[in-house]
Amino acid sequence: LHSTSRRQRQMCIRDRGMKEMLDRNISFSLYMTHGGTSFGHWGGANFPNFSPTCTSYDYDAPINESGKVTPKFLEVRDLLKQYLPEGEELAPIPDSIPTIAVPEFKLDEVAVLFDNLPEPKISKDIKSMEAFDQGWGSILYRTTLPASKEEQTLIITEAHDWAQVFLNGKKLATLSRLKGEGTVILPPMKEESRLDILVEAMGRMNFGKGIYDWKGITEKVELQSNDGNITSLKDWQVYNIPVDYSFAQNKKYEKRDNTEKYPAYYRGTFTLDKVGDTFLNMMNWSKGMVLSLIHISEPTRHSLIS
């Protein structure tokens, strides 16, 4: 073992453990044989310090995320062959799913979220996302703030999980549950102003005490003046923003270049002569999601919304 690489040592230990169980006729399973992908917002999160996991569930499994066999798969297969009844053989390995390259295209249509909101739900008090019949996606809380000659501090308690704060449509701050952030300094306001808090739900903690992982703003939103007085904000308009292609598709899209500072849907289309698996390069990505709709025709037309 001393002359082998770390990966080779791990393989030796794994295969040795499997062989020992097979020699003793012990049943076992591999976690994971194929990890795959957690699509949408179905990813989990670690506990106690909230840490959402990515949508990739590859797990360095014998069958990788895209369904291809790995050297690990072949090694496990070779081991299992030794324990087959005489005359039996393992089934042949299926061919890999074909892959294709998508032609270059632009996300050249834009629908600004604040211009495309659904009908709001009215709530006296702040409530979690689940209270508004939504389990994942994003949710927008909106209320009106009174005029103030001085700066004030906005205190958001337990925003789960990633919040953007806007005042009269202008973005003031981003608050992350991962970093324990929850306060924003508000500038003086000459008149009543619109406060928007857009909260995105990320992975849910799925074990232990953290299993009751409500999303949205789960406790309260308060306004603190310079003299220390704290007021709980009431009278909210709440907008459900689900992770749903039809919701994103039925928006007013237009050619527009000045939306960088606003949450928005960006749409582009491309045409394929043949279909196959493909992969998005997310190296320059920041925050968001990708939805894809396939129009079956000849050739095939795809619409991508991010």
Question: How would you describe each model-predicted region?
Answer:
Residues L1, R6-Q10, R16-I26, S38-W42, ...:
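Active-site region of glycoside hydrolase catalytic domains
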Residues H2-I13, H295-S306:
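Single conserved hydrophobic/aromatic residue that forms the stacking wall/gate
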Residues R16-T70:
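Aromatic/acidic polysaccharide-binding cleft in carbohydrate-active enzymes
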Residues G35, N64, K72, L79-Y83, ...:
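An acidic-aromatic loop/edge-strand motif
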Residues K72, E150-E151, D161-E191, S297, ...:
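A cross-kingdom feature marking solvent-exposed beta-strand/loop segments within repeated
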Residues L84-D133:
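Flexible inter-domain linker/hinge segments
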Residues L140-E150, T157, I185-K190, R267-G276:
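Extracellular and analogous surface-interaction loops
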Residues E151-F166, F270-L293, S297:
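Aromatic-lined ligand-binding clefts that engage carbohydrates, nucleic acids, or primary amines
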